[in-house]
Amino acid sequence: IGAEIQSSPENVFTNQLNYGEIKIGKDRYITLTASDAHAIQKAHDILTEEACNPPTIKALSKMVFLNEQKLKAGFSAKYHMSISEYTNSIRMTMAENLLSTTDLSIDEIAKQLGYNYSSNFVKMFKKTHGKTPLAFRKLKNWYIYFIYFLLN
C-alpha cells in the first residue's frame, strides 16, 4: 500500500480536527483524526513491548479501538514500514544484541525472540543482515579481539 499523508481542515460533522488523509489507492483516501493518530501511537507502543510475541493485526486493532485498515495504513504512513516489518526490525535488533553480548545458542536466542523454529529465525536474520546469526557472532567476536589487540 502506497501511503501519503495530506493535511485536511476541520471536519464540520464531527467537530474534530483531521490529522490528515492517507492515500491508499488511485482515488481512495482514509482520513485520520487526532484520536486515530493516538491509537496508532498506542499500537506502536504495544508492538514495541510485545515484539517477541506480537498480537495479530485483528487483536491489535481491537486493543487500540481502530479498524484494521486504518491501523495498517496509518502505521505505514507514520513509521514508513508495515507492522510486521516493525516487529521484525525490533526482533533483529534484539538478536544482534544477544549474539554480541551473550553465549546463548542460536536455538535459545530464537526461542527468546518468539520464533517457534530456529530455522525461521536464521532465515529472517540472514535476510536482514546478509549473513547467518553464527557468522554475525563470529565476525563481531573477531572485531572485538582485533580492537583489543590494537589497543594493547
Model-derived features: positions:
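Residue-level marker of structural boundaries
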Residues: 52, 80, 92, 104, ...
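Hydrophobic positions on the alpha-helical face of helix-turn-helix-like DNA-binding modules
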Residues: 106-110
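A generic structural signal for secondary-structure junctions
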Residues: 33, 114, 138-141
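DNA-contacting interfaces and partner/effector-binding or oligomerization modules
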Residues: 1-12, 152
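Basic/polar phosphate-binding segments, predominantly the helix-turn-helix DNA-binding elements
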Residues: 18-25, 42, 46-87, 112-132
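Short, basic, alpha-helical segments at the C-terminal edge of helix-turn-helix-like DNA-binding modules
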Residues: 87-96, 135-148
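A short, Lys/Arg-enriched amphipathic alpha-helix from helix-turn-helix/homeodomain DNA-binding modules
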Residues: 13-54, 88-104
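Short, positively charged and aromatic/hydrophobic N-terminal segments
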Residues: 21, 148-152
